[in-house]
Each structure stands twice: as structure tokens, then as C-alpha cells.
């Protein structure tokens, strides 16, 4: 019942069809997902999706592509902030961050299935929080029971209100940065808390 989930979270499938980092011509390669934050044309993504790139473009759901530049990269947490080179053009609606996100074990969370963005209604994946603090020495990483496929790192993690509470990292990517996560269950994924 994706329609019910979209309605409950006050979301629209088109809110997600805009944020694919994708090729625009031969030689370009699609490498990840991201989402707009704020009204200045900034995007969040997982930094490995732009690793080794000299030029980066985003492709919107209507096929339009725009160049972006790297603003900041947070190496430890695998986060990159990108900015549209021409933010004066019409921008998609940015996602709303939860002011005071709560992370409690067994709380329900949602993620967009970015692998199915070519369909008119991309699906939402529903999961739950397994560990509020997945690392002993940091309160920034949450462990999830949520299906996250390769290439979906950099997408938003939503709460029941449809607000962003984190940035999703697939298991293998999170484990490369944090050795404590090596023993995570097979179905686990992770998120950087917002």
C-alpha cells in the first residue's frame, strides 16, 4: 500500500524523481543518489558516488541535467555536499529535516527505492531501527533493519512524519569506514543521523 504510505508521510513520488546523479552523454556514468536540502541548490549524497569525478551532473525526473560542484566532503562519514552551479533555475522542492529527530530501537523508518525511479510511483521501503547508536564511540550512526541495495547510499531516511532524519549508507560502505560494524547482521543497513 504505497499510496497509503505516501499519504501518511505527506510525500509525493515526484519529490524523489529529481535527485539521481546520472550520466548525460557517452562517457558519463550513473553513480548514486542524493537529495536537495534548503533553497540554495545544495544536495546531500554519499561521497563515494562522486569519487574520482572531474565533472558532476544531476539529472532531474524531467530529463533535465545540471552541473554541480563539490562544496564539502566529510570523509569519515562518507557524506558530500554538492551545489548546483546555476541555482537560479527552478529548483525542486527540498526535503524537510526533522527538527529534533528521535532514534529509538524498533521505531519505523522509510527509504525511497531509488533503483525504481524510472517507474511512475517509486516504492518506499519500510524498516525499523535496530540500534540507536551502532558505534561505541559515536552517536552519529544508526543501525537499521531496512532493505538498502548497492547504489542507494546517499538517499534520505524518513520518519513517520515524512521528515528526513538521516542519510542512508548501504552496509558494505558503512563497514569500510567503521570496523565496529563488521559484525552487523546480514540484513542490516546504516544511516548517518541528521
What do the PLM-derived regions correspond to, one by one?
Residues 1-29:
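Protease-domain processing segments flanking chymotrypsin-fold serine proteases, especially trypsin-like
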Residues 18-40, 46, 64-67, 154, ...:
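A conserved glycine-rich beta-strand in the N-terminal activation segment of trypsin-fold
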Residues 24, 39, 61, 82-90, ...:
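A structural micro-motif recognizing beta-strand termini
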Residues 37-39, 71-73, 132-133, 160, ...:
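Residue-level recognition of beta-strand microenvironments
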Residues 90-141, 148-153, 168-181:
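Flexible, gly/ser-rich surface segments that form the specificity/activation loops bordering the active-site cleft
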Amino acid at each position: 500500500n504505497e499510496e497509503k504510505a505516501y499519504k501518511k508521510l505527506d510525500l509525493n513520488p515526484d519529490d524523489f524523481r529529481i535527485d539521481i546523479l546520472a550520466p548525460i552523454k557517452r562517457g558519463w556514468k550513473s553513480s548514486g543518489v542524493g537529495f536537495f536540502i534548503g533553497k540554495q541548490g545544495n544536495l546531500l549524497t554519499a561521497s563515494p558516488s562522486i569519487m574520482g569525478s572531474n565533472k558532476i551532473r544531476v539529472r532531474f525526473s524531467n530529463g533535465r541535467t545540471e552541473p554541480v560542484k563539490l562544496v564539502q566532503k566529510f570523509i569519515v562519514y562518507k557524506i558530500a555536499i554538492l551545489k548546483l552551479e546555476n541555482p537560479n533555475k527552478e529548483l525542486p522542492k527540498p526535503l524537510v529535516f526533522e527538527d529534533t529527530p528521535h532514534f529509538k530501537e524498533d521505531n519505523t523508518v522509510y527509504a525511497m527505492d531509488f533503483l525504481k525511479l524510472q517507474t511512475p510511483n517509486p516504492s518506499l521501503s519500510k524498516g525499523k531501527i535496530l540500534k540507536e547508536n551502532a558505534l561505541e564511540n559515536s552517536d552519529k550512526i544508526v543501525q537499521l533493519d531496512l532493505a538498502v541495495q548497492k547504489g542507494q547510499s546517499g538517499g534520505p531516511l524518513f520518519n513517520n512524519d515524512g521528515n528526513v532524519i538521516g542519510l542512508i549508507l548501504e552496509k558494505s560502505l558503512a563497514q569500510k569506514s567503521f570496523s565496529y560494524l563488521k559484525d552487523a547482521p546480514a540484513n542490516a543497513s546504516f544511516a548517518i543521523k541528521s
